[in-house]
Curated annotation (Swiss-Prot):
Residues 639-815 form the PCI domain. This is Eukaryotic translation initiation factor 3 subunit C. SUPFAM superfamilies: Winged helix' DNA-binding domain. Residues 1-21, 157-281, 847-910 are annotated as: Disordered. Component of the eukaryotic translation initiation factor 3 (eIF-3) complex, which is involved in protein synthesis of a specialized repertoire of mRNAs and, together with other initiation factors, stimulates binding of mRNA and methionyl-tRNAi to the 40S ribosome. The eIF-3 complex specifically targets and initiates translation of a subset of mRNAs involved in cell proliferation. Residues 11-20, 162-186, 209-235 have a biased composition (Acidic residues). One of its GO terms (biological process) is formation of cytoplasmic translation initiation complex. Residues 193-207, 862-874, 895-910 have a biased composition (Low complexity).
Length: 910
């Protein structure tokens, strides 16, 4: 029997229902339904219900995947969720006034928390499979990018995550039912507007409490029904559409009642929890037996210095043991400090407790390679500064690691406390660097951590003041080096203003501070490492502020390049950074050759990123082990200290272009021509091998295109490739006073293009006008005259200057292109003949033939034959040498004749 319609009246008795079924059976038999139609329940749902049900099913799938940490499927489900939400947007805009449903925001928040939890679990991440690890990175990026549009909703949700909307109640009920197929289809998220309607219509549809009628019979309207029933139907169904809609059965209504009861219980619990929170704070009970916090002192104990020190020794004796609660240890030390301050036990005792708190915070993190927690970092900064302020305020407290524990004095002045604030601040500085390395350099977290550098430098300054008052030279050198390492890479614009006279000479700049600190280390340090690092930092700081000559002199006088190979890796990294910055300084000052020499060792290896400790290149198989990679990552520099690698490479390639292109033009036919820059030469050759070259896009392509233009002497095209909007944005605008650098570059391009032009086309001209060259290259006539004179003096250009006519006369002493190629061909043929002769000698040998080994009488004959005609190889070599000498003699005669002709012309002119 078809169950297409449910019974409309639940108040009828069983007997009347059977009569109606009997009377209606014959009429209903006229309608024949297929078996498929009999098994299907007709459900009419709105678009909002469909969209919301799709969203909730995907959210449930995501939660299941999260429980088993199935990250690839979580990623695919998240992509499905975003697509489903995009489809539901029109419905949300229409029904919810554009407000994102709370259950969707809850899903995003839970997903973000799940990703952060998995990402922070380093040990767990290492054990992930390759597919899971890759999917985790992709999912993290996509979620972080996606939730940017929901930041306000997420922040509001996180402020009150326990509040639930009506739509979210449906989701909770759906998940609490156990996940039936029927429940999934009927218990989806319903529209918020439909919920009140369902509540209002419930009394009309609800049956009495003792009504147990079945809902499985078919209610067909017949003529035999009473008028009361028909009138009830008319009141119950306002239109024909409602008459044929699915009606809820008793079982479904019971399920709905259960869900409503559960929701009421949940809301009641939340309300009670909020009321309890208003009464007072609650503590989370840890699973297992509760460990009572140990009492500090007895109730009636007299608290004095020996008792506090004994308690301090008792707390610190558990340091480093296996089952020590390190968090509890820190709390006890803070409590002991408060007790000491309350009973006025003296500043020395307080300093001692402060130092032990610092040690306990350092001990909290057992893995030295990992950074400490942010809460401990903030606590450490606060305690460290508090301790140093106490030491500076009380000059009679002497804190040193040379003080033995039995010689500590807390009763009478001067007070002696065992401890080393220098070691504490050095560890503090190292922890700060670890925190920076751990953060994503492009996130706000990195900026937040970088703001802590102010407090770190302030703490170092406090320690520096303390050791300047009472400290050894070695301790002062160590703390000076820490301050130098926070100062040397920072640019101070006041230095250049002071150079230009815009500031008074008495103004103290960072260069003056560096001079003071470094000179003390040069004079007082007895360890090579501190002095070497101070020199390197000093050179770096000078180079950053364009003090080229001071930086160069320091490099030459210190002989660092001779001893740097024996230094530790951190010092070698600092040396590489210094050379890179020195090369940039030389380039800014117009010393192109020096800039190239400084950068060539870094760039020729192809690994400047690794040499400057700014990242690791993808490794080949078994190139380095996991332990080596871990050590190298620890040596990396923080992101804010990086040198722009693209800027470095551009400066190197431009310097190489300005040196290499004129050299190539001058030695075009020289077979033994050497390469000034191997990297630039390879870039040039690879570009020439390409059959089709498009317009330049990258920085390297711009430099190569400029080099090709310079080879033709076209300085304008060369300058346009080097100095343009794209290159300015990528490279030149990164320089301080970038306009001056661009002007300097254009000037050098003009001069080197002129030199290249003269080298390339000197065999074409008999004479050339200097004013014409000056006009062509937009250079002053004296500058052109100076360039040509220098080329003639260095014997690079065979020409003579005629000052009255302002012309350059070419001597044409160099061979033409055909002659140069012919001479190269002759040299190569001669080399080939020599090689063949050597091979022939090796095959024949210089011993007598095997057939005449026993005939001693023939030895004289063979010797005579060798002397007469057998030595034809030697004769041929002699003949070649004579021909060579004759050619050289002929050339000398030609040179002599040309000189004589010039002398005759000079005499005639006089």
């Amino acid at each position: 029997m078809s169950r297409f319609f449910a019974n409309g009246s639940e108040s009828e008795s069983e007997s009347s229902e059977e009569e109606i079924q009997a009377t209606n059976f014959n009429k209903a038999s006229a309608f024949q339904f297929s078996d498929d139609e009999e098994e299907v329940k007709r459900v009419v749902r709105s678009t909002k219900e469909k969209r919301y049900e799709n969203l909730t099913s995907i959210i449930k799938t995501i939660r299941n995947h999260k429980k088993i940490k199935d990250i690839p499927n979580t990623l695919s489900s998240f992509e499905d969720l975003t697509r489903a939400y995009q489809k539901a947007l029109p419905v949300i805009s229409k029904e919810e006034n554009g407000i994102t449903p709370r259950f969707y925001i809850r899903c995003l928040a839970e997903l973000e928390d799940f990703i952060n939890e998995v990402w922070e679990d380093r040990e767990g991440r290492k054990n992930l499979s390759k597919n899971n690890s890759k999917s985790l990175g992709t999912l993290r990026q996509k979620v972080r990018k996606y939730i940017k549009d929901f930041e306000d909703d997420l922040s509001r949700f996180r402020e009150a995550p326990d509040q639930e909307s009506e739509a979210e109640d449906e989701v909770v009920a759906l998940e609490s039912d156990g996940g039936d197929a029927g429940d999934d289809s009927d218990a989806g998220v319903k529209p918020t507007e439909a919920a009140p309607k369902a509540v209002k219509s419930a009394p009309a549809k609800a049956a009495p409490a003792d009504d147990d009628d079945s809902d499985d019979s078919i209610d067909w309207d017949s003529d035999s029904e009473s008028e009361t029933e028909s009138s009830d139907d008319e009141n119950q169904y306002q239109n024909m559409r409602e008459r044929f809609l699915k009606r809820t059965t008793e079982k479904e209504e019971k399920d709905d009642d259960k869900r409503k009861d559960k929701r009421k219980e949940q809301k009641t619990k939340i309300r009670k929890r909020a009321e309890d929170d208003e009464d007072g704070e609650w503590e989370t009970v840890v699973k297992g037996h509760v460990v009572e916090k140990p009492k500090m002192f007895e109730k009636d104990a007299e608290i004095d210095v020996p008792l506090v020190l004994a308690k301090l020794l008792e707390i610190m004796s558990a340091r480093g043991k296996k089952r020590t609660d390190r968090r509890l240890q820190i709390d006890l030390l803070f409590e002991l400090r408060d007790i000491s301050d309350q009973h006025n036990l003296g500043t020395a005792v307080s300093v001692k407790i402060h130092f032990n708190i610092i040690s306990a915070i350092y001990d909290y993190n057992q893995k030295i390679s990992e950074p400490m927690k942010l809460e401990h970092w903030a606590l450490l900064l606060e305690v460290m500064q508090s301790m140093m302020k106490l030491l500076l305020a009380n000059a009679d407290i002497i804190m040193s690691e040379s003080v033995a524990e039995e010689h500590e004095e807390y009763a009478t002045s001067p007070f002696y406390v065992r401890g080393c604030p220098l070691a504490a601040v050095e560890r503090l500085d190292d922890e700060f660097v670890k925190l920076l390395k751990e953060c994503d350099p492009h996130s706000n977290d990195y900026v937040s951590r970088l703001k802590d550098e102010v407090n770190v430098v302030k703490t170092i300054e406090l320690v520096l003041q303390y050791f300047e008052r009472s400290g050894t030279n070695n301790e002062r050198c160590r703390i000076y080096l820490r301050k130098i390492e926070h100062l040397y890479y920072k640019f101070d614009p006041e230095v250049l203003k002071k150079k230009r006279g815009e500031l008074p000479a008495t103004t103290s700049t960072s260069v003056d501070v560096m001079d003071k600190l470094c000179k003390f280390i040069y004079a007082k340090d007895d360890t090579d490492r501190i002095r070497t690092r101070a020199i390197l930092a000093h050179i770096y700081h000078h180079a950053m502020h364009d003090n080229w000559f001071q930086a160069r002199d320091l490099v030459l006088m210190s002989h660092l390049q001779d001893n740097i190979d024996a230094a530790d890796p951190a010092t070698r990294i600092l040396y590489n950074r210094m050379m890179a910055n020195l090369g940039l300084c030389a380039f800014r000052q117009g010393n192109v050759k020096d800039a190239h020499h400084c950068l060539v060792d870094l760039m020729v290896t192809g690994k400047p990123k690794e040499l400057l400790a700014q990242g690791l290149l993808p490794q080949r198989q078994h190139e380095r082990s996991a332990e080596q990679e871990k050590i190298e990552k620890q040596r990396q520099m923080p992101f804010h200290m990086h040198i722009n690698l693209e800027l470095l490479e551009c400066v190197y390639l431009v310097s190489a272009m300005l040196l290499e292109i004129p050299y190539i033009a001058a030695h075009e036919f020289d077979a033994r021509r050497r390469m000034i820059s191997k990297t630039f030469y390879q870039q040039l050759r690879s570009s020439e091998r390409q059959s089709l070259v498009g317009p330049p896009e990258s920085m390297r392509e711009h430099v190569v295109a400029a080099a090709k233009a310079m080879r033709c002497g076209n300085w304008q095209a060369c300058a346009n490739f080097i100095v343009n909007k794209k290159m300015n944005t990528k490279v030149w605008d990164l320089f301080y006073e970038s306009d001056r650098v661009r002007e300097m570059l254009t000037k050098f391009i003009k001069e080197e293009s002129l030199r290249t032009y003269l080298f390339t086309y000197s065999n074409v001209y008999t004479s050339i006008s200097i004013p014409s060259l000056a006009q062509m290259y937009e250079l002053p006539v004296p500058k052109v005259h100076s360039i040509i004179s220098k080329m003639i003096i260095n014997e690079e250009l065979m020409a003579s200057l005629d000052d009255p006519s302002e012309t350059v006369g070419m001597h044409r002493s160099e061979p033409s292109r055909l002659q140069a190629l012919a001479m190269q061909f002759v040299d190569k043929v001669t080399n080939l003949v020599d090689v063949n002769e050597k091979v022939f000698d090796m095959k024949q040998g210089n011993f007598f033939q095997r057939g005449n080994m026993g005939n001693r009488g023939d030895r004289g004959y063979n010797r005579n034959q060798n002397n007469q005609g057998g030595n034809w190889l030697g004769q041929r070599r002699d003949r070649n040498n004579r021909n060579r000498n004759q050619r050289g003699h002929h050339k000398n005669n030609q040179d002599r004749q040309q000189q004589q002709q010039q002398q005759v012309q000079t005499i005639d002119e006089e």
